UniProtKB/Swiss-Prot annotation:
Native source organism of the sequence: Caulobacter vibrioides (strain ATCC 19089 / CIP 103742 / CB 15) (Caulobacter crescentus)
Function: Negative regulator of class I heat shock genes (grpE-dnaK-dnaJ and groELS operons). Prevents heat-shock induction of these operons.
Protein name, UniProt field: Heat-inducible transcription repressor HrcA
Gene that specifies this protein: hrcA
Matches recorded under NCBIfam families: hrcA
GO BP of this protein: negative regulation of DNA-templated transcription
Length: 358
């Protein structure tokens, strides 16, 4: 049995507080619910091989409900696990296996395509998880720590400018910017020269901190158009922790494929709203960066998903030297197939880390 890295600590009854009968019935209810998505009745448990009458099973299920581990939705006679119950099941009962060899080969083959950019590889990893695990695949890009080697503004026409930043580690980042009226080739060159003289060798974090006090000087040294380009360029590259990072989400349509999800459009709509809160979701995945393995959040364990009642299973991806780069995971309904999704997330994160290592 695998002990998992939990989400935030939530007070739930411990296994020691349940006798053998209660533990067995609780496990069977949760396993049946995760498989079918339907509330589980006492007769279902009785037919599953429990040597107790339906009445005795109902009494035990009632006791589990009073402990906050089971709940009865609407007027249904059946029971389903609460988020607290799912947390106890994941931490105390869940047995996690390994990823099938065929799936391992598929993950490795899709991530090993040559000529793919850094962000394309991350997007592919997110799509892989979405397809294999169901739910939406999510990945947050690393904090850029390499020093800046070169900066350039390239006119594209049609009112757009391409801001190009080349890093000392060979990575290139491009940002499309609106071209203000009156921008001339000389203003673009002037802005490029100004930034190259001051950013070369600095990380984006250092640049964001140190350049703040230099913008006033930039306005005095440059013409107004070039100064605005410098300011807009810095904002495009490093305008704060949320804006400096990319969040990639794939497979949101999977969240509508579940039969129960179709019955609860409000919950799905709330989940889509949650996914649109980019900065908060990046913050959640940044917490995963500090974890030593897979991290699981269930429902109200995060403020972000407290209303939609969704679950997040995520893991950090890192280099061979154990330098954490970012985090990748799956978001879906609370009844995700944890035994299947957890190893998929873990293996994809490890393959992605190896690929980023070159």
């Amino acid at each position: 049995m695998t002990q998992l890295f939990p989400g935030p600590i939530v007070r739930t009854p411990g296994l020691a507080e349940l006798d053998a009968r209660a533990r067995d019935i609780f496990r069977r209810v949760v396993e049946s619910y995760l498989e079918t998505g339907e509330p589980v009745g006492s007769r279902t448990i009785s037919k599953g091989g429990v040597a107790l009458s339906p009445a005795s099973i109902r009494n035990t299920m009632q006791d589990l409900a009073q402990l906050g581990l089971l709940d009865a939705p609407h007027t249904s006679a059946g029971r389903m696990p609460t988020h607290a119950g799912l947390r106890m099941f994941v931490d105390g009962f869940l047995e996690v296996g390994d990823v099938a060899e065929q799936e391992k080969r598929a993950i490795e083959a899709r991530l090993a395509v040559k000529g793919r950019s850094f962000e394309e590889a991350l997007a592919e990893a997110s799509s892989i998880l979405s397809g294999l695990a169901g739910g939406a695949g999510i990945v947050v890009t690393p904090v850029r720590e390499g020093g800046v080697k070169h900066v350039e503004f390239v006119p594209l026409g049609g009112g757009q400018v391409l801001a190009v930043m080349v890093f000392e580690d060979g990575q290139v980042e491009n940002r499309l910017m609106r071209q203000a009226p009156g921008v001339t080739p000389s203003a673009l060159q002037e802005a490029s020269n100004f930034l190259n003289a001051r950013l070369r060798g600095r990380t984006l974090t250092e640049a964001r901190t140190e350049m703040g006090g230099e913008l006033d000087a930039a306005r005095r040294q440059l013409n107004e158009t070039a100064a605005r380009l410098v300011e807009d360029g810095l904002a495009a590259w490093s305008g704060g922790e949320g804006d400096a990072r990319s969040l990639i989400v794939r497979g949101q349509a999977n969240l509508l494929a579940d039969a129960r999800a179709r019955e609860d459009i409000d919950r799905v709509r709330q989940l889509f709203d949650d996914l649109s809160r980019r900065a908060q979701l990046i913050g959640l995945l940044d917490d995963v960066r500090d974890a030593e393995g897979v991290r699981i959040y269930i429902g109200a364990e995060t403020r972000l998903f407290s209303l939609s009642g969704s679950s997040v299973i995520a893991a950090p991806y890192m280099t061979g030297r154990q330098k954490v780069l970012g985090a990748i995971g799956v978001i879906g309904p609370a009844r995700l197939n944890y035994a299947r999704v957890i190893p998929l997330v873990d293996y994809t994160a490890r393959v992605l880390g190896r690929m980023m290592d070159g």
